[in-house]
């Protein structure tokens, strides 16, 4: 809904902020709560 959210890491690390522009997929970019994803953490401006 908001265009952003947080990913909870399996290893218990801090939640990771994710913006819809960072999702690598075709068409409507969305993630569902509880969906398993793979990701790489990058430092942003904030």
Swiss-Prot record:
Instruction: State how it assembles.
Output: Homodimer.
Record has Cytoplasm as a keyword:
yes
Q: Which domain of life is it from?
A: Bacteria
Query: Where, per UniProt, does this protein localize?
Result: Cytoplasm
Q: Note the InterPro entries from the entry.
A: Cold_shock_CspA, CSD, CSD_CS, CSP_DNA-bd, NA-bd_OB-fold
The protein, known as: Major cold shock protein
User: Where is it found, in Gene Ontology cellular component terms?
Assistant: cytosol
Matching Pfam families, A to Z? CSD
Induction (record text): In response to low temperature.
Q: Which UniProt keywords apply?
A: Activator, Cytoplasm, DNA-binding, Stress response, Transcription, Transcription regulation
What molecular function terms (GO) are annotated for this protein?
A: DNA binding
Q: Where in the numbering of this chain does the CSD domain appear?
A: 1-46
- Where the protein is mainly located, per its record? cytoplasm
């Amino acid at each position: 809904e908001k265009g952003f959210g947080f990913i909870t890491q399996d290893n218990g690390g801090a939640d990771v902020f994710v913006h819809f522009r960072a999702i690598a997929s075709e068409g409507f970019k969305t993630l569902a709560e509880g969906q398993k994803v793979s990701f790489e953490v990058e430092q942003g401006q904030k």
